Amino acid sequence: MFTREVKETVLKRFPTIELSYDKLIHNKVYADLFMIIPKGPKAFLWFTYIENKNVAILLLLNKQGNVKSLDIYPICFEDNLSLGTLMYGTFFDINSYHHFSCEDIFTYKGRYVNNNRLNEKLKIYERIFKNEILQKSYNKNFVIVGMPLWTSSYMNAINTIPTLPYKVYAIKSYNMRDKNGRSLGINLYKEKVKLEAVFKVKASIESDVYNLYCSDNQLYNVAAISSYKQSIMLNSIFRKIKENI
């Protein structure tokens, strides 16, 4: 935990940046790269120094984009990142282990890179995650820093989401030809909820009519019989008919 004095000193050195918010996409846009964004609070991850120590500071943001808390977290990284590397992304947990998913980068070793083309940023990410950050957690205090999952099509992103070990907030779209490297916007992801229920089933006098009852014996509805095969199966369970014997 920071003392009030140290916190104020650290925030005075925080880079002056303009945080742009992604617009919601309602219509089809031309994009050739898609980022799957995890669900969780937004945060900055700042590799810097305090006195003579190189540190990684996680700054959690509120919904207005203001810093609501900051803490030092153990992360395996090369010291030269502390020349001033600032990432923006999502903080979330998987099986009680902390993760930070880097969606954007503002400064890299003291150099402002946020206006770089997307392909230039991707090269920086590759350098960082190949050589300068070790994605390892020695205990549950550590933060594992990584990239969101990228796909080349929107449908690939949609089909991939159910296989991920974390909840998803949105899909962010990019056009590699854009010079400023910024996203075209995001599509919020709505998780499909599968509803399951157990009913009491009672056969009606009419053929292929089965009434469904709740646990308090209140009638809910009538079961749908969509095929002859289902009709035979339900008859064999709930009725005694010679043709089914």
Predicted segments, located by residue:
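Nucleic-acid 5′ end/cap handling module spanning
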Residues: 15-65, 92-95, 108, 130-245
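Conserved loop->alpha-helix
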Residues: 55-93
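Generic structural signal of hydrophobic/aromatic residues within well-ordered alpha-helices
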Residues: 6, 10, 125, 129, ...
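Elongated alpha-helical scaffolds
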Residues: 98-101, 105
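Hydrophobic, proline/glycine-rich low-complexity stretches
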Residues: 1-14, 23
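Eukaryotic endomembrane system proteins
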Residues: 89-90, 101, 110, 116-137, ...
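A short, structural micro-pattern
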Residues: 80-83, 99, 165
